[in-house]
Amino acid sequence: MTNIRKSHPLFKLINDALIDLPAPSNISSWWNFGSLLGICLLIQILTGLFLAMHYTSDTATAFQSVTHICRDVNYGWILRYLHANGASMFFICLFLHVGRGLYYGSYIYTETWNVGILLLFAVMATAFMGYVLPWGQMSFWGATVITNLLSAIPYIGTNLVEWIWGGFSVDKATLTRFFAFHFLLPFIISALVVVHLLFLHETGSNNPTGIPSDMDMIPFHPYYTIKDMLGALIMILALLLLVLFSPDLLGDPDNYIPANPLNTPPHIKPEWYFLFAYAILRSIPNKLGGVLALVLSILILALMPLLHTSKQRSMMFRPLSQCMFWLLVADLLTLTWIGGQPVEHPFIIIGQLASILYFLLILVLMPLVSIVENHLLKW
């Protein structure tokens, strides 16, 4: 009799994805982040579900309901801070996952890569709408500033913004619909994750060398299940340290002030994980130009398969490309720092130079360096 896990239609799916899946024997810890992202998504959905049971999406009571969760609900404080800091862990894993894909040429699997970009946009949209829900000062003004960017779209911009707001300013209708979408999107993300995995399992995983590994595969279980469990343990430990010792480290103190449309905070800034894009947005004096640069800063990832000029897939044996990659990482860290600074000298010019360098590296320098490497290797 065949083993039930190989014959039962449901168990067979799980078996082929998590147990008998052939995996390259040499994938490093950089390949752990896919499973870590899955765990992050699960943590966010579970904590979010319990928070939604106590939250009210009304401008009059939203702020109070969050306070009520933290003070009166059993373990409500840990739910709230797990959810808020879980988002930060989610983005740390996301950025490392995308960085791994760039470094090792995983974007050559175009379908998997493009679904991944869709996932990135969906997670960013979810995080933005979630940040609005506590209805603090930064929630309100962040929502006002970011939704207002759509008014830069020619002809339909103003109508579009008012349609999204459900009125002439960010108000009750906006908060209610943001809550509805914030609840809905994680389930859409879950569906996209399944599609992402479906495409990945069509081709199999890439590996650090970028060389096909069909002749040297090992079963996913027990080798990579135990490896993923170690990664999960480290991540959960880091998350718990953050939640239990300094839960407000990554938040903005202004969000402990209830939303007030008559009082603008001195520095409006998003959560840390959006600062790099916010810095690019602010670097361009023109509104429409800034919005386009903001969208393109993420959408440019879709061009990566077209910009791959090297004859090798991975950067493992390409020292010049490695220099460009780490320059890009340093540039993104600079942009993140600039995004949190006030708009004044010297931060303006640093932000503009970092923004130019970001696009220059991806569109010009990295493809050029790859061509140079091909010639150096006489290929």
Swiss-Prot record:
Any single GO BP term: mitochondrial electron transport, ubiquinol to cytochrome c
Cofactor: heme b
One Gene Ontology cellular component: mitochondrial inner membrane
Residues noted as binding a ubiquinone in the record, renumbered to the chain: H201
GO molecular function, one term: ubiquinol-cytochrome-c reductase activity
Subcellular locations according to the entry: Mitochondrion inner membrane
Keywords: Electron transport, Heme, Iron, Membrane, Metal-binding, Mitochondrion, Mitochondrion inner membrane, Respiratory chain, Transmembrane, Transmembrane helix, Transport, Ubiquinone
Additional information: Heme 1 (or BL or b562) is low-potential and absorbs at about 562 nm, and heme 2 (or BH or b566) is high-potential and absorbs at about 566 nm.
PANTHER family (UniProt xref): CYTOCHROME B
Function: Component of the ubiquinol-cytochrome c reductase complex (complex III or cytochrome b-c1 complex) that is part of the mitochondrial respiratory chain. The b-c1 complex mediates electron transfer from ubiquinol to cytochrome c. Contributes to the generation of a proton gradient across the mitochondrial membrane that is then used for ATP synthesis.
Name of protein: Cytochrome b
Organism: Ptenochirus jagorii
